[in-house]
Amino acid sequence: MTTATTNPSTYPNAMAVARYVGISASKARRVIDLVRGKSVEEALDILRWAPQQASEPVAKVIASAAANAQNNEGLDPSTLVVATIHADEGPTAKRIRPRAQGRAFRIRKRTSHITVIVESRPSREGRRGGAGESAGGARARRAQGSKAAAAKKAPASSSTKAATTTEASEEAKGGSQ
């Protein structure tokens, strides 16, 4: 079911493959799209509560890839991310369903091959050390600048609006001309 390997990548990784899984590839892809790019812990939590039947075999393959990373590659399980995950079509078994008046319909029992590659990436908190705070600081400074500019413009426009409103109300009352 599983194979440990290292693909050429910038991060250390491990791989697991489940072949001939008794679910169609299109149904497996519905579940796979939920967890692509997530951390392994988050992906397993999502799959634990997903109602689709394909969530169980996909969760098994992700757990197997995480175990391969920890045991074979010596990677920290808390830093693992589902980097690549895909489902390919496997062989299709054909069966016959008898129908009325001597007819028969074909049943296609589809299988799939599910491949998962997990990478050990530094946590988001660790990556934000210097560059993230400067970007956040720049964003805060831009926001303050735009707030200050809006505050300078706001009183002028509100006083103009107030004068226009006063003139309109005076005319409506039939006041000074």
Curated annotation (Swiss-Prot):
One BP annotation, GO: translation
Short name of any one Pfam family annotated for the protein: Ribosomal_L22
Subunit structure: Part of the 50S ribosomal subunit.
Region annotated Disordered, chain positions: 118-177
Keywords: Ribonucleoprotein, Ribosomal protein, RNA-binding, rRNA-binding
Domain of life: Bacteria
GO molecular function: rRNA binding; structural constituent of ribosome
Ranges annotated as biased composition (Basic and acidic residues): 121-130
Protein name according to UniProt: Large ribosomal subunit protein uL22
Functional summary from the UniProt entry: This protein binds specifically to 23S rRNA; its binding is stimulated by other ribosomal proteins, e.g. L4, L17, and L20. It is important during the early stages of 50S assembly. It makes multiple contacts with different domains of the 23S rRNA in the assembled 50S subunit and ribosome. The globular domain of the protein is located near the polypeptide exit tunnel on the outside of the subunit, while an extended beta-hairpin is found that lines the wall of the exit tunnel in the center of the 70S ribosome.
Compositional bias (Low complexity): 145-167
Family label: Belongs to the universal ribosomal protein uL22 family.
GO CC term (a single one): cytosolic large ribosomal subunit
Family annotation (HAMAP family): Ribosomal_uL22_B (MF_01331_B)
This protein's record includes keyword rRNA-binding: yes
Bilayer-spanning residue ranges: none
